[in-house]
């Protein structure tokens, strides 16, 4: 399976979906891992650590969403990321469903 790890784009989110150690484990199990360029920088991981673990560094999140079978994130996808998801692509992330509802939606009883 081809696993993609984009850089988190939600403000003040510095984590990344996979650490280099996790990448090493997944690659050892036969998976291909794509990590967005400098995706782990804010979490304290550089591109070199990911490549040494077996990941391929790709330029943009769009490249990851276009090529990966599964997307691994920390935070709920932002609209631009939802728009990049493909049919039958798996998204592995935390979801914050309360953020999906507005007061208008909560009042809708239909």
Segments from the language model and where they lie:
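Glycine-rich phosphate/diphosphate-binding loop of Rossmann-like nucleotide-binding domains
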Residues: 7, 12-36
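Short acidic low-complexity segments
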Residues: 54-67
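N-terminal beta-loop-helix "entrance" segment that forms/cooperates
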Residues: 37-56
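Redox-cofactor binding/interface segments in oxidoreductases and associated redox assembly factors
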Residues: 5, 72-73, 92-93
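Single conserved hydrophobic/aromatic residue that forms the stacking wall/gate
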Residues: 101-110
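Rossmann-fold NAD(P) dinucleotide-binding segment
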Residues: 76-91
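Rossmann-like NAD(P)-binding element
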Residues: 64-77
């Amino acid at each position: 399976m081809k696993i993609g790890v984009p850089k988190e784009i939600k403000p003040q989110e510095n984590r990344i979906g996979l650490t280099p150690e996790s990448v090493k484990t997944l690659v050892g199990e036969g998976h291909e891992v794509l990590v967005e360029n400098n995706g782990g920088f804010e979490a304290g991981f550089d591109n070199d650590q990911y490549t040494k673990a077996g990941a391929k560094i790709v330029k943009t999140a769009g490249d990851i969403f276009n090529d990966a079978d599964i997307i691994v994130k920390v935070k709920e996808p932002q609209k631009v990321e939802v728009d990049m998801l493909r049919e039958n692509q798996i998204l592995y992330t935390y979801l914050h469903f309360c953020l999906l509802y507005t007061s208008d939606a909560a009042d809708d009883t239909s």
